[in-house]
Amino acid sequence: MTSPFLQRHVGPSDSEQQQMLSALGYADMAAFLADVVPEDILDEFPPQGLLPPGCGEAEALVHLREIAAANNSRRSLIGLGYYGTSTPALIQRHVFENPAWYTAYTPYQAEIAQGRLEALLNFQTLISELTGLPIANASLLDEATAAAEAMSLSYGICRRTEANRFLVDANVLPQTWAVLQTRAEPLGIDLERVTPEQASFDASVFGVLLQLPGADGQIWDPTAVIARAHEAGALVTVAIDPLAQALIAPVASFGADIAVGSAQRFGVPMGFGGPHAAFFATKDTYKRQIPGRLVGQSRDSAGNPALRLALQTREQHIRRDKATSNICTAQVLLAVMASFYAVHHGPEGLMSIARRIVGQRRQLERALQSLGFVVPDGERFDTVTVTSALAPAVHQAVGEAGFNLRVLPDGANPAESTGFGIALDECTTADELSRLVAALATAAGQTSPSLPLAPVEELCGVPERVDPWLSQSVFHDHLSETELMRYIQRLVSRDLSLVHGMIPLGSCTMKLNAAAELLPVSWPAFAGLHPFAPMAQAAGYQRLAEQLEAWLAALTGFAAVSLQPNAGSQGEYAGLLVIRAWHRSRGDDHRDVCLIPTSAHGTNPASAVMAGLKVVAVACDADGNIDQQDLAARAAEHADRLAALMVTYPSTHGVFETGIRGICELVHRHGGQVYLDGANLNAQVGLCRPGAFGADVCHLNLHKTFCIPHGGGGPGVGPIGVADHLAPFLPGHPMQASPDQAIGPVSAAALGSASILPISWMYLRMMGAEALRQATAVALLSANYLALRLDPHYPVLFRGATGRVAHECILDLRPLKRDAGIDVDDIAKRLMDYGFHAPTVSWPVAGTVMVEPTESESLAELDRFADAMIAIRNEIRDIESGAMDASNNPLKQAPHTMAAVIAEDWDRPYSRQQAAFPLPDQQQNKVWPAVARIDNAYGDRNLICTCPSVEEIAVAVAA
């Protein structure tokens, strides 16, 4: 039986699908699929029996509630980078649960993304003010990988050939240490764990990572250590707690070169490990090496301030194997939440929360001392760690009282532990503290002491923050809920997302993110768990993960799946590390060559380099396919050293290549493994399986194919599926039992961004195998329908052997530059006037656009987009004929803002109506660009990546 959810997920009705098939010349869907998907990989039937049959929303939610109920939401005071936090209801309602925020894409088209960019600029300003460093990025994946990025940056900047040592604070978070080990080994970096004050620095040291506060809560003044590191020519990274930093002097004042951390405790639930927005701040000197997205201010064609992504030439999609990082998708939605949390509280509110935690921690320490526990000397922020023979009794007593504490040593059985750690947080109350102390007293065999008031004196041993901070008006003007609600809505009105219309970005799969799929993410049973809570308390998450892994394995034809990678780029990296580990287990350490087609996503070569592999390019032929003769030559040339081929399927040119089985067999004959980039898996689900036609590893983008929303640039999840012989090498984690051959972790938490996995679970549970197959078929049909409509106006550049495209098509705009002086950016900006986000521009071929409609868009929406593109082509024809001016025309002047259209003066040779309302239906559904066309070059030359201060505004007003 067909899933009742199918008609909600798929846009075109049955009759509309038949209409589209008829337009393409097919009698039915089966005939169409036989023409599109190569016969030798097309599965006759979907994997029935391996997935449950589809069901409705209510039934799926009932099943998922049963799973969630198996989680035990004890109050976790474990700390280690994850803390209880109170998400303001306003932010949960108007941001986290608002599709205008979570369905947008990365803000490449900045003129229709000003709201999101402003929220991210607020985030960057927050981090810059907390750290005292002038440049902060718009988020990274988690604190551990941010620290690894800092290590890589430090290594890349160092020019001393003998420098390959990276010193790491012994008090670093355990997950950070583990991720650093994973990242360092393939790059030839020697890690050394040290007590910072006792560390020796010489010319072999290129960088240092300090933790402030440390994993045990200690805070200290690192100024002298940093000075010694600088004398030896090493860069210093400090991993910070942003809430502690509200009280501690900015780390830049200690001399830090880089600061990293997680903004999780700024209003984002723990969620069993993620997703959370990490951050990376540094000195201006290193702005061109900073990983991830960077929002900067520029100006538009009218001279008004405008925001956009800055310094993009340093990123992986341009620099490829020379990129500073493979990061693309990060954690924009979570960074936006954290920024609004800071706007909601303001600097005084943040400091008040931090002071309250310090006071409660001092109360706790006095109670511990009165019970006979030895509290270590030194100053702390929120955490106290105690070594005691009573530790097993403590863990039992606090567990019975409903608490989890850190078990020392990390990973030990509580019954055999030698100590415990207690981390207080924003959610700690006086009553909770009393119950905790009572449990500690029970363990000590004593009467519970009263909790004396503990006034917050000055922090000892570390300079405090004394200068004003967050003086920007945005952090002071919205402290009332009314003002903040209106501010959030103002930003929403400056953005375009799926609530406005189709976003036809090729290779991005902007499909429906159904409300029922997202609803469970905010359930406390999923949101409230600490990732290092005892596994027995996470039985629901384990069951969810096991089912999701099994379903994904069935759909892809692989033997095993890891859900740990928290982005597609990290899935690539993890998959290549798995291949590398397999080769090394066989004594083939010398296999280090990775073949990559020149058409590949930029993350492919960037990930290969990170995995310690040497990239060898493989040519593509005139039809966009892998040049199989060149592939055979390269495979033969490097046969003794061949580790892997990275291949995207369907290809990045939007077609099913007919020789994929032969390609896989060729690589295997030469001793290599096949890594399949799953960015285009939405064209395969239910129709063909990578594991069945020869791939050994494939990463899946749950934020594309399996309905996790893009969030304006994250979160994402990039799990990997592997063949049976590679399963023992899937990523492990230091806080859980892992197979002996497992590679190290690639994410801070064992399940990566665990709290958004219910989204994909809901999608698969509601759809079932047959509906998934139908959805994929409609995605292919919609792309071919658009190709049919648009080809007479914009030639489709690449087609498969039967003349069909896969789930996306590339339109060739290059002749328009020659004939009319119109380039791809002109068309992208003009589409905004028609109410559309542009397709992917100039990738994988410069001067083209790649269109991917997905299965979720109705025939009416497909036609609306086609009508807009055709209308723009007719405007270009007017330029070609001379009927319209070559420079002063609707395309060159696009996009048109409301301010421009209603201005008293209108000196353009076309009407205001043609500028703003070129199609009749726009009178009722107009999306206005917030700014005119942005001058990107000006912004990069005059880089401004934070909000202006009050003083800067005053100077500007006076001028």
UniProtKB/Swiss-Prot annotation:
Principal EC category: oxidoreductase
Keywords, comma-separated and alphabetical:
Oxidoreductase, Pyridoxal phosphate
Q: Does the keyword Oxidoreductase apply?
A: yes
Give residues where N6-(pyridoxal phosphate)lysine occurs.
Answer: K704
Enumerate the cofactors the protein uses.
pyridoxal 5'-phosphate
Mention any Pfam family matching this sequence.
Answer: GcvP2_C
Which CDD domains does the UniProt entry name for this protein?
Answer: GDC-P
EC number of this enzyme: 1.4.4.2
Query: One GO CC term of this entry?
Result: glycine cleavage complex
Q: Extract the InterPro entries matched here.
A: GcvP, GDC-P_C, GDC-P_N, GDC_P, PyrdxlP-dep_Trfase, PyrdxlP-dep_Trfase_major, PyrdxlP-dep_Trfase_small
Q: One GO biological process from the UniProt record?
A: glycine decarboxylation via glycine cleavage system
* One GO MF term attached to the UniProt entry: glycine dehydrogenase (decarboxylating) activity
Protein role: The glycine cleavage system catalyzes the degradation of glycine. The P protein binds the alpha-amino group of glycine through its pyridoxal phosphate cofactor; CO(2) is released and the remaining methylamine moiety is then transferred to the lipoamide cofactor of the H protein.
Subunit relationships: The glycine cleavage system is composed of four proteins: P, T, L and H.
Family from the record? Belongs to the GcvP family.
What protein does this entry describe? Glycine dehydrogenase (decarboxylating)
